[in-house]
Design a protein with these regions (language model features):
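Bacterial N-terminal signal peptides
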Residues: 33-44
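Short, low-complexity intrinsically disordered segments enriched in A/P/G/S/L with frequent Arg
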Residues: 11, 15-31
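Catalytic cores of peptidoglycan-degrading enzymes
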Residues: 180-308
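Tryptophan (W) side chains
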Residues: 4-7
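Cationic-aromatic interfacial patches
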Residues: 49-124, 129-131
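Surface-exposed, glycine-biased beta-strand/turn segments
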Residues: 53, 124-235
Length: 308
């Protein structure tokens, strides 16, 4: 079964029943702030033989998937840009699943693999260029654009906690990286947007936003461990899940956190509820996916992706 979604000027409703929707859509504070043309995406309901790895997209903010040779046991240890890299077995061989930072320059790159005997091998690959759209938002709370000195001190403390969560590494890997959509709602802001708040440039959008009513349940897209919860200046009430081998997801702006640090959650288990905490223009869930400490597009973890 296929579902066609074409961008008009309104957000689209996406059901969790089709797993995570591959979306190139964005509704900023108002749809007039961003203009997208020529986008048409097809979502295909996954079959029993669906791809277990994320979709390869070797662009800044994307994912490179590199087959490794020789096929030895145990799995080789792989590094890229000083970070340990996820290695999964797929199609009968080891594959390096590499998260590419949004700040990465297009061009040649290399990962290095080391086998159990200490022998190393380099795997070159190319990062393609990608231009992300611009988003302009207007915030009524000026502190969210120009924080006070006290706010800045708090933000600095919180950034240390957030970075520590994103740097988490556990050896255990999930057998499948196919996601569930964390919440029923409308994709209102896509990944990678170059953001301006009240005409002031800010960091690119490091996840996707899903607009939904306050109190709408949020579920774990994959099984994992709760490695951090808290309430942060910009992010509001937040949950971090560690899914193994450098794959970490973050859920922001909650009204309620339904899990405790240290808990193990299954795929589809409720972890919180949609809210308006932190820096927001309306109720929504901000969902970030981090792979080897690089923020990557969450839609690459969806069952199928076809661009037209």
């Amino acid at each position: 079964m296929a579902i066609w979604i074409v961008w008009l000027k309104k957000p689209v409703k996406i059901s969790r029943s089709v797993r995570c929707a591959r979306s190139g859509f964005h509704r900023a504070h108002s749809a007039r702030y961003i203009f997208v043309t020529g986008i048409c995406l097809m979502l295909t309901v996954s079959s029993a033989h669906a791809q277990e790895l994320p979709h390869a997209s070797p662009v800044p903010g994307g994912i490179a998937i590199l087959p490794l040779v020789p096929d030895t046991e145990p799995a080789p240890v792989v590094h890229f840009a000083g970070q340990r890299i996820m290695v999964m077995r797929h199609d009968g061989r080891w594959q390096a699943v590499v998260g590419l930072p949004l700040t990465l320059a297009p061009g040649p790159q290399t990962v290095t693999a080391r086998d159990s005997e200490g022998k190393t091998r380099d795997y070159p690959f190319a990062v393609q260029s990608k231009e992300y759209a611009v988003q302009r938002l207007t915030l009524k709370d000026k502190r969210m654009v120009e924080p006070t000195a006290e706010d800045l001190a708090r933000i600095t403390r919180e950034q240390s906690i957030i970075q520590q969560a994103f740097a988490a590494w556990t050896e255990e890997a999930l057998p499948s990286l196919r996601c569930l959509l964390p919440v029923h709602g409308s994709v209102s802001s896509v990944f990678g947007l170059r953001r301006f708040f009240n005409n002031e440039p800010r960091q690119p959008h490091s996840g996707i936003d899903i607009a939904a009513s306050v109190g709408t349940p949020i579920v774990a897209p994959l099984a994992g461990s709760v490695i951090q919860t808290g309430e942060y200046f910009f992010n509001g009430k937040t949950v971090f899940l560690d899914h193994g081998q450098g794959l970490v997801s973050m859920f922001n702006h909650l009204s309620r956190v339904a899990v405790e640090r240290g808990a193990r959650v299954s795929q589809g288990q409720k972890i919180g509820e949609v809210g308006m905490s932190g820096r927001v223009t309306g109720p929504h869930l901000h969902w970030t996916v981090s792979l080897n400490n690089s923020r990557v597009d969450p839609v690459l973890f969806l069952p199928e992706k076809n661009n037209h």
